[in-house]
């Protein structure tokens, strides 16, 4: 067993006379030259067979002059002396592993390694690994591409040695990595992926507003807005068809507030529908205003005067604010052709805040001459408002003369079109002109 471990031993005996000088040097009790310890590794220490108890003299092995003394300043503690019973005159050039009774002492730096074995020729001195990849063993040129034939990937060949380097900060954009090469002017350039501008565009748009920015962008699309408007109009049409009374509730609201100078539903409903159709949302209410002219105005001037007087009477009485926009409707008769009379409605809008005043007229409805003459005959000669018209309206005459005819809506009996529809058409045209003249912030 001892021979297998590489230690030459002899039975204990009296040293020969030729080695007397050596035995004197062996009188020391400590080993002068420390033997390299065995580092902790999975390999187990060689097992020695038990030997009989003999005196364990200490000996020192002369170190050749060519061997440098160990550099480690950390003393090693041995559990026991080597089981050697004798000394030899020739120096033993074999390394003997020794067992430690304590853990391996920590090395102060990566460059501290165990001393080389005691051979005639000193072993190579180990140094720290290089900080740059080794380039020896192969030649490089500026025209050689190491990525050729690897589909853009780094080749797994000895040309790309594995080495460890300091952590590299990850940059947001692709960069060109260059490995420094000593003694060469060329560099290794990795392929750089082109930057996609769409990625930054999407990122900027997403960070600007997130999900709300996306919704805002979709809602601002003209095509999407048109589809939404059509859908809204379709839903409102279905609701108002099933229940016509719901129209005023659906479209009531917004910044547009209009007062109609009448409490008659035929006028208020027509103006409400017209302004809500043009502005989308509008609040339209009615107040009873007085015209202060004859009940049946005659001529354009009288009709316009009656409509304006209704607005002024409401403002004088304080029923509406002086700056309140108002719409007034006044019907009159006029002889447009010889012995041909027509009923016409005058519709005006007055907005003192923005200085807007507009007029519009409904379509002319023919009135038979005999009914006009009856209205003139029922009016006294000394009537104080004779300058503005007649004291009896054409509707009252028609109601007396014809069955199933109403004084307020006799137009449908003569034309098939109701008075409300006529006022609605004129009011819608008036609302369109009014909208064009309003500042954008009101809309």
Curated annotation (Swiss-Prot):
Keywords: Cytoplasm, Golgi apparatus. Residues 1-25, 106-129 are annotated as: Disordered. It is found in: Golgi apparatus; Cytoplasm. One of its GO terms (cellular component) is cytoplasm. InterPro entries: ITPase-like_fam, NTPase/PRRC1, PRRC1. SUPFAM superfamilies: ITPase-like. Its main location: Golgi. One of its GO terms (biological process) is epithelial structure maintenance. Coiled coil: none annotated. One of its GO terms (molecular function) is protein kinase A regulatory subunit binding. It comes from the Eukaryota. Belongs to the PRRC1 family. May act as a regulator of the protein kinase A (PKA) during embryonic development. This is Protein PRRC1. It comes from Xenopus tropicalis (Western clawed frog). The gene is prrc1.
């Amino acid at each position: 067993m001892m021979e297998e471990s590489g230690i030459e031993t002899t039975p204990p005996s009296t040293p020969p006379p030729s080695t007397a000088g050596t035995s004197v040097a062996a009188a020391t009790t400590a080993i002068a030259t420390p033997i390299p310890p065995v580092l902790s590794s999975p390999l187990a220490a060689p097992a020695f067979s038990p030997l009989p108890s003999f005196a364990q003299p200490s000996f020192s092995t002369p170190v050749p002059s060519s061997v440098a003394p160990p550099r480690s300043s950390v003393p090693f503690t041995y559990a026991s002396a080597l089981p050697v019973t004798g000394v030899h005159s020739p120096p033993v050039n074999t390394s003997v592993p020794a067992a430690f009774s304590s853990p391996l002492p920590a090395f102060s730096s990566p460059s501290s390694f165990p001393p080389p074995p005691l051979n005639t020729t000193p072993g190579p001195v180990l140094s720290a690994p290089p900080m740059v990849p080794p380039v020896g063993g192969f030649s490089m040129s500026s025209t050689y591409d190491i990525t050729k034939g690897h589909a853009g990937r780094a080749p797994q060949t000895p040309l790309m040695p594995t080495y460890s380097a300091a952590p590299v900060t990850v940059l947001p954009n692709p960069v060109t990595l260059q490995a420094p090469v000593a003694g060469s002017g060329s560099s290794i350039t990795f392929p750089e992926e082109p930057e996609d501008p769409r990625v930054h565009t999407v990122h900027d748009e997403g960070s600007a507003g997130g999900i709300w920015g996306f919704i805002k962008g979709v809602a601002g699309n003209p095509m999407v807005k048109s589809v939404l408007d059509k859908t809204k109009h379709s839903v409102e049409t279905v609701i108002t068809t099933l229940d016509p009374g719901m129209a005023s509730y659906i479209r009531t609201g917004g910044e547009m507030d209009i007062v109609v100078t009448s409490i008659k539903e035929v006028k208020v409903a027509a103006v409400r529908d017209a302004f809500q159709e043009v502005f989308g949302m509008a609040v339209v209410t009615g107040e009873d205003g007085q015209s202060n002219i004859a009940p049946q105005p005659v001529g354009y001037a009288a009709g316009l005067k009656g409509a304006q007087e209704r607005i002024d009477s409401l403002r004088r009485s304080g029923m509406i604010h002086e700056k309140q926009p108002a719409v007034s409707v006044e019907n009159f008769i006029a002889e447009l052709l010889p012995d041909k009379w027509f009923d016409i409605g005058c519709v005006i809008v007055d907005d003192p805040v923005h200085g807007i005043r507009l007029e519009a007229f409904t379509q002319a409805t023919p009135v038979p001459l005999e009914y006009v003459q009856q209205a003139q005959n029922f009016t006294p000669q000394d009537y104080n408002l004779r300058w503005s018209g007649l004291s009896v309206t054409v509707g009252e005459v028609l109601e007396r003369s014809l069955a199933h005819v109403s004084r307020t809506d006799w137009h449908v009996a003569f034309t098939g079109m109701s008075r409300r529809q006529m006022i609605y058409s004129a009011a819608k045209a008036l609302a369109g002109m009014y909208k064009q003249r309003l500042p954008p912030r009101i809309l």
